[in-house]
Amino acid sequence: MAGHERLRHKSPAEWLKTVRAFEAMPEAVLKRLYAECHLQSVERGQTLLKGGEIPDALYIVTSGRFRTSRFASEPAKAEMGPGAVLAETAFLAREPHDTAITAVRSSIVLKLEWESFKALAEAAPDVWQGAIRSLVHTQGRVYAAPRTHADRARSLAICPAGGETVPANFAACLAEAIEHRAECQILSSEGLGQDLPGGIALDDPQVVHWLKEQESHFEVIILVTDPEPTPWTERALAEADEICLIGTHDGGRLGTPVPLGPVEELAFEMRGADACRLALFHDPRRGATVAGTRRWLEYRPVRSHHHLRPNQVKDFERLARFLLGQSTGFFASAPGVFGAATLGIFKAVQASGFEPDCFAGTGAGAAIAACLALGMDPDDVDQLVVEIMVERRALRRKSWPLFSLYNPRILDKLILKHFPDTDLADLPVPFYAASANLSTGEPQIHSLGNLQVAVRANWTFPGILPPFIDEEGQMLIDGSSISPPPIQPMHRLNAGPNVVARAAMPPFGKSPVRYRDLPAWQKQVSGRLPWQKPPEGPSLPSFEGVLTAANDRSGDERSWLGPLDMLLAAPIPHGTDVLAWHEHSHLKDLTYQWALNELEKRAAAGNLPLVAAIPTS
């Protein structure tokens, strides 16, 4: 489907159709519009539009990459590549654009000036009619596939990390993985004759034209830098949409941080760490076990890091998706037993052919996402939770309610037993968890550090277990109460689509007990012995249920969901308690069926961004 189709070159009409206001225009009208357009070259660092200005033209990126920021000198808010429409709303509304737009590298845009558009529209009313029809047609619609390929990289630079050179076969292996999605070409200084006496001047107009021509003929260009800073290395880093640092890891868990190599220093200086990803080759003699990744990350605050394990072709395929802007993610957020709902949702989207490239979670969803990132089957994850919470009765010891309702000692031992003592950076796929930090009042993002800590901090809702106190004295609790959900780190990792799995608690309804009758009701309920059945008659939500409902808020989803993210909020059956762990498997199965039906309905309505990432075979 759309997400797995090979990239192809666009016709003039197709470039114009990336503009929402032109999408439904007849072909004849689009041709008249295209006649008013012209191509414009934009040099790296050149500001195309200043913040606060009314755009005098509409720009469609055909080659290169741009960044938006409040001022040209500020950090980027977003980056946009081929297919992106720049300042579209401000252009049509004749309003100031709130951010500056600057070229990250040498780029080419298709430019339609306002005066030309206005003159054509006045002479041909069908231009305005087509624009209005398009805007009405697209109003409120969620696209089933990316409307543009703004986040898809067209040029990739690969360079050595640490003191080693890039392995000889790396570029070929990466190209093979990319070829399943796009035609690509590998360019190096050797291929350009840079190694010959006299070499080739990279600023020669013929060379510049030839390089641009390669980008137009191939869908992806892989630029292999030299082992040290050279004019070619600098050119490759400047022209790349994505920079991939390649290191060879010896597998040692302990040791000093790996220092930056000269090409890495140049890459960070020219483009910043956010333009870079780190890929680590792992020594085949150490098998598939990954350890010691933090030694590499100490000096490299990269956008993401990836593991290339021996004989794991899928690792190269995943890296290719990240570099091309076609990777996907799964974010699970739910407290207590409601985490089973996120597991059922994952099982449903997996059955539909969707395989996420990265995982994240809060609350019980953090433990579930961690297990999935480790490669566990959803049903095995379900059985693990049942063993910990039902068979081993992790919360069987209540505590005097000074700090929490339950004693955490048994649960802590079971987490240490069933979850690996590993660093999050060593997981085979990108992962993070988010807990709520009571010490700072801010979300605590766990992308590095011990996996067991991330799981324990999120396991049970606040008040039920005491906060987890880490080695720095930070008090951490279940992050499913964070509003809005902390999905921003996932947006930094990938372009999407991302599946956001949540549990939707039903309202409690009106109380069956009058307020003045509460003391008598409480006395009746609390007077029974543990083995006795609850008294017949009206019931009220449990203390745990009230706590959960009071913190069940995510705000307006439009403010935090990405344009391709898909929220699946599974309805929880009325009366299900957040600590009803014996219902875990049943709740997972109910949610699985609900999610399958929901995916089918959304697909039939054309409202399924997820479909863009599902292969056709």
Annotated model-derived regions:
Residues 1-168, 180, 252:
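Cytosolic regulatory regions built on CNB/CRP/Popeye-like sensor folds
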Residues 40-42, 80, 112, 187, ...:
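Hydrophobic residues at beta-strand termini and immediately following loops
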Residues 51-57, 161-167, 334-338, 357-366, ...:
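Gly/Ser-rich catalytic serine loop of serine hydrolases
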Residues 150-199, 214, 319, 364:
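Walker A/P-loop phosphate-binding motif and the immediately C-terminal alpha-helix
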Residues 204-206:
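Flexible loop/N-cap segments at domain edges
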Residues 209, 215-219, 228-359, 370-617:
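Patatin-like phospholipase
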